Amino acid sequence: MSSLLSFYRNILNFPLSLLVKSQAIPTDPVSELGLNLEQPIIYVLPYTSQTDLLILQKNCLALNLPDPLVENDIQGQSLPRYVFLDEGHRFFKSKGVKSETESLFYRYLDLHKTDETLDVQLVPVSVLWGRSPGKETAPSLRLLSRFQRIIAMIWFGRDNFVRFSQAVSLCYMVKEYGAEKGIAQKLARVAKIHFAKQRYSAMGPRLPERQAMFDKLIQLPTIVQAIEDEAKTKKIPIPKARQEAEKILDEIAADVSHGTLRMADRVLSWLWNKLYQGINVQNADRVRKLALEGHEIIYVPCHRSHMDYLLLSYILYHQGVVPPHIAAGINLNFWPAGPFFRRGGAFFIRRTFKGNRLYSTVFREYLAELFYRGYSVEYFIEGGRSRTGRLLEPKTGMVSMTLQALQRGLNRPISIVPVYIGYEHVLEVDTYAKELRGAAKEKENAELVLRVIKKLRNLGQGYVNFGKPIQVNSYLNQHFPEWKLPPVENVRPKWLNEAVDAIAKQVMVNINNAAAVNAKNLIGSVLLASRQRALSREQLIEQVESYLQLFQNVSYSSDIILPTESADEMLEHVLALPRSGVMSEKDNFGEMIRLDRESAVLMTYYRNNIQHLFVLPSLVASIVLHNEAASKTLIRETVSHIYPFLKAELFLHFDEKEVLEQVELILTEFIRQQIVKYDGDVLTINRRRLPTLQLHAAGIREILQRYYISLSLLLECPAISRTLLEKESRMIAQRLSILHGINAPEFFDKAIFSTFTASLKAQGYFDLEGHTVIEKVEEVAHILRRLISVEVQLTIQGAMDKVDQIDEKLE
């Protein structure tokens, strides 16, 4: 290296150290990209820039990666550890790959001919200054003078990202394609294409001029026809109907501002640091990969809190991906939040489109336009925030519009990315509990925002886990090949409804497959399983350890996030959380861990986040506990009868065969932990571990009681209507919750009973005429009687006096 260049770099390092704060993507490239530090690495940058090279060096040293300014010594040769792809006088407007770059690639390839153990890793790296894609009417980026570079350093110094890409194995390249000069040229060309794709995935398409977009949409034949129909139906002039359509567009459409996104990034960085001890992000590489491959990405998260809108966009921005346009409820379009959300990417949607064809047409075409222009989109498939902590039944309208846009000729593959979002504390959880007890939902407004801000404090950990993507084109090709048939105008395809329902359910399953187990929801689950919401410290720790071993040894799914802390560390963490409701008390016998009564209701919310993970082990434990001695055949038969209802209610992913395999693994683990004994084909209770078995079994207790209530009503009155069945089931459940101290508000939630009756219908418990199939109902009711305490059965039977009133209503 020349002394002049060395001097220049030393001078340049000073302003960089003051002005630039960069973020590496991914944050741990060695593990996330699978880099082998025992083998040489060569960094490839897209264009010549000493500034970018020095920023890369700083990040490499911080990440324990080889210094790019130190040469690789291979077979007695010293070769540069970095290379610039082209001159870079214009951003992504190349004069061609530098000849010395191709020459260096060839020299590295040639070294592999004589050393089979050598595997040089070629790592593409981009240094991004700012993330604004610009407007559609803006000119292409021009030559940057030194003065302009200084301005960029000042303006974007805190908005700088170093993006490491998947390494290319030169050993593999040589084995597959040889080590000729043509291969070196091909490597350089492929690298150029990769950098162009990477820039697009980080910045996205140009932002539209809002009015120009409106002018285009308002002239679409479908909207023109809807305007004419509106004018005819309401007997108003067409110009007035057109004004209404324009007003709807203005109400709906986002108005993205990169300046707002940058400001939001600063504010949210402060907010997360104030609120949470950490935000745990998993599987973001899935999203980066889809973005690089040019997919239209649709993010579909579960909806726990209004914080979800902000958190997901923030995480995506810091993962080097364009934040999406977000479908937000019209209730959030209030000052000052509405304008801020709109400029941050929110587009607003009314609660219902029913009876408003003009609105539904305009909204559908706006959504399709976002897809066609290449903007990623986010919508909440549950339709609203879950008040119980469970996933709600999916609302399929947005999925339907997505498939319709695809069928109309979207030229890129669509991938739906389910996202699990979880918190150790949800700001609105107190409000949810009140609403479940019958309080009216409070309308969002500025005063409500201020009240929430006052609650800002240590809220523990947050979790964002990107689930397995659903590649819609491939899914439809496999399950609904007729989707490729040309659509008939004004005729809804027969396959569409079934496909929409199937994809919506799969999204929910994949969200649950990506759940995060944390200290609060696990310890809360254990305490809620105890009769008095209290356990000795020793028993609590033993139960938590039992669950951790179960989750590790009998995996629910490969996407689940499990704690890395010990049971003791998890307990200390929860005890330190404000308003957790978990308290430590000491007496002459030792330390007790207790959950106070008021907090018990709130804790059910967090338990419900992960209830689907332990419901199957709980069912197995309950079968052994209540039978005292149970054969594997009995266990399998019982699970086979009850599992379909659990699968529908909790969006479980096992099919009929897989669930029996999972049961076998659970039994093996219970035997290994000595919770049960195994003799021949019979499993019996290990009295020494009886408390542990009881706590495992309690996880499904309330669910089985709900099922038994509805089935008992069906047996008493087979002609009962579905509506009345759900109503009377809820009444009995409310009575049961009072008499037996059940603190879970969802125990008598209308939606859960509705899901159960729908499952009964789907599983053939009603015939084609809607009559109850008594034999099937009696069979499952008989199974449930063996799994429910006599006291609870008597309470339910006592409440069955209401059946006489039902009969009178039916007559």
UniProtKB/Swiss-Prot annotation:
Per the record, the pathway is:
Phospholipid metabolism; CDP-diacylglycerol biosynthesis; CDP-diacylglycerol from sn-glycerol 3-phosphate: step 1/3
Domain of life assignment: Bacteria
Identify this protein by name.
Glycerol-3-phosphate acyltransferase
The catalytic activity of this protein is classed by the Enzyme Commission as 2.3.1.15
Record keywords, A-Z: Acyltransferase, Cell inner membrane, Cell membrane, Lipid biosynthesis, Lipid metabolism, Membrane, Phospholipid biosynthesis, Phospholipid metabolism, Transferase
Family statement drawn from the similarity comment of this UniProt entry = Belongs to the GPAT/DAPAT family.
Which organism does this record belong to?
Haemophilus ducreyi (strain 35000HP / ATCC 700724)
GO molecular function terms noted in the UniProt entry: glycerol-3-phosphate O-acyltransferase activity
Write the lineage as a comma-separated list: Bacteria, Pseudomonadati, Pseudomonadota, Gammaproteobacteria, Pasteurellales
User: Which CDD domains does the UniProt record give?
Assistant: LPLAT_DHAPAT-like
**Which InterPro entries does the UniProt entry name for this protein?**
GPAT/DHAPAT, GPAT/DHAPAT_C, GPAT/DHAPAT_LPLAT, GPAT_PlsB, Plipid/glycerol_acylTrfase
Q: Which HAMAP family match?
A: Glyc3P_acyltrans
Entry's localization field: Cell inner membrane
Is Acyltransferase a UniProt keyword of this protein?
yes
Q: What is known of its domains?
A: The HXXXXD motif is essential for acyltransferase activity and may constitute the binding site for the phosphate moiety of the glycerol-3-phosphate.
First-tier enzyme category under EC:
transferase
A Gene Ontology annotation in the biological process aspect, one of them, is:
fatty acid metabolic process
